[in-house]
């Protein structure tokens, strides 16, 4: 199964991050990479003018960088996490 660049998949990624107590917000800003992660506050801000594809790639990049423990992942998100780390 490949990653589908749809709003539904974007929502799955947002819910995955929220299950680890991160807040995902879409706002305008001048981020060099298109997003900003406030690790201490567990807040993720993504440029709201990104396309759906850009938002998904940003979310995937963030998930890969924040050291999510797959063992503590809720069952409903394990499939999504495995898909991300497979690619």
PLM regions and their residue ranges:
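Active-site scaffold of zinc-dependent metalloenzymes
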Residues: 20, 28-53
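Auxiliary, metal-adjacent structural segments of Zn-dependent hydrolase domains
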Residues: 1-32
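Post-HEXXH active-site segment of zinc metalloproteases
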Residues: 33, 53-56, 66-87
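A near-ubiquitous, low-amplitude feature marking generic local secondary-structure context
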Residues: 7, 42-46, 64
